[in-house]
Amino acid sequence: MKQIIFDCDSTAGIPGYPMDDALALFYLLGRPQEAEVLAVTCTFGNGTTEQVYRASRDLLSEAGWERLPVICGSSQGEEPVSDAARFIVEETRKKPGELSFVGIGSLTNLYGASLLDPGIFDRLKEIVLMGGYTAPLLYHGSHLDELNFSVNPEAAAWVLNHGKNISILTGNNTLEPSYLPKEEFYTAMGQNEAGRYLAEK
């Protein structure tokens, strides 16, 4: 089973904001035999860090996952060392070689953690990121900018140059999710708490 620190800029629940990060989180929460999410660490991107923190906390509480820690990172333009960065360092010290870092927002929190403790990259089992692109990002005929690395390019460059065991899913891989009709989605997802919550939404 993978033990995961889930680092995101989820804004699900805020009118007019995207919910893709929340879908990724609930995908993991719906597979307790395969993955254990230890905490959600919040960064900026889709919204401010404070918006992401409140939205993530409210979403998890509404869905019955209020016991899952939600930890705030630094805001855009601030020093990258934060509660989220310190949490990442502490958890990797407790479980060296066991934790997966999944980052689907800016890489500010992992960057901040590495500034606190450069040995963190040796203690993480793997780093899985969403960012970059290998072809133009087209959505409904419009060109999209890069989705995550460009939000904090200094942090992204640092992690990509110093991190180890990195896997990257580009925007081209993640832009076009497949959707089932509502009835089929409910049947497929309604077997666990996370799936039922998403199906009902």
Description of each model-found segment:
Residues 1-201:
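N-terminal acidic, glycine/proline-rich low-complexity segments
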